[in-house]
Amino acid sequence: MKTVKIRLDSIDKVKDFVNKISNYDSDFDLISGRYVIDAKSIMGIFSLDLSRPIELAIHSDEDYDEIIKVLATFIEE
């Protein structure tokens, strides 16, 4: 499992993010404080505080580099 910080600060970004990660069979979790939700769940994402960066846990080693490229617009430096 590897983690990166992402920012999802608009409805369009959330929809785009979920559409992109739904193309992968891997599991993804979003971690915000003490809450951990399935990153493929739009309803779950909207239950988080989206005003701050969120930690994305990627449970895949073989697709990691490709996933990072696809999600580059959401990743916080």
PLM regions and their residue ranges:
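N-terminal intrinsically disordered, cationic/polar leader segments
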Residues: 4, 18-22, 29, 36, ...
